[in-house]
Amino acid sequence: MASFTIYPAIDMRGGKCVRLLQGDYNKETVYGDSPVAMAEQFAAQGAEWIHMVDLDGAKEGRRVNDRFVIEAANRLSVNVQVGGGIRTEEDVAYYLERGVARVILGSAAISNPTFVKKMLQTYGRRIVIGIDARDGFVATEGWLETSNVKAEELGQMLAEAGAETFIFTDIATDGTLSGPNITAAVRLAEATGKEVIASGGVRSLDDLRALREYAEQGIGGAIVGKALYTNQFTLAEALKAVNER
């Protein structure tokens, strides 16, 4: 059976762990003062990967909370992937040379496709493409803008350019605990023929089991945030649920 990975999410703003509702910077809840301590807790529960997002960076277009990412990547025996505020080759190299396993490129895929293609050629599988969609269309700039490009179109273009892994976020479900948009994630996996990690809306172990059912179709994992922070289930329970045979 195809593997399925749980990615606990740590969204950072002002050096704290926060969650936003549907990407709205005015709807923030703080869940912890230390991103690295949070990463340690997830590692202790068995995480193989941790998904870290620099929300300040996404908004400002530069690295802001990068020191926490580097510290987590180097102190813990887990793989760290990071997104937010990564706009230049220097940003990509900065993280990858300092122990971070993978870098997520999101908005840049629309605003600067040449750059993204070059990064895919240079770094291969260490580049993950984040596709964030609102009603099927790609959103950019920290979700503040919506483009006229369909998620599957962007996915196909970047798969041809060498992308092997996508993170698909359905903005309508993000931070809502309303259930993931499985259909849209599977559509992207089928359109690209590549691995898609689903993000947004996971609220229960059953949601994770439901996503896991599509592992053979290319759904390679799920990013889980709010459900962990609001104690819907623990990371240890999530890992157990998706590894049941």
UniProtKB/Swiss-Prot annotation:
Class of the enzyme per the UniProt entry, highest EC level: isomerase
Location of the protein in the cell: Cytoplasm
EC numbers on record: 5.3.1.16
Catalytic residues in the record: 11 (proton acceptor), 132 (proton donor)
UniProt feature coiled coil, ranges: none
A GO term from the CC aspect: cytoplasm
Listed name of the protein: 1-(5-phosphoribosyl)-5-[(5-phosphoribosylamino)methylideneamino] imidazole-4-carboxamide isomerase
Protein source organism: Geobacillus thermodenitrificans (strain NG80-2)
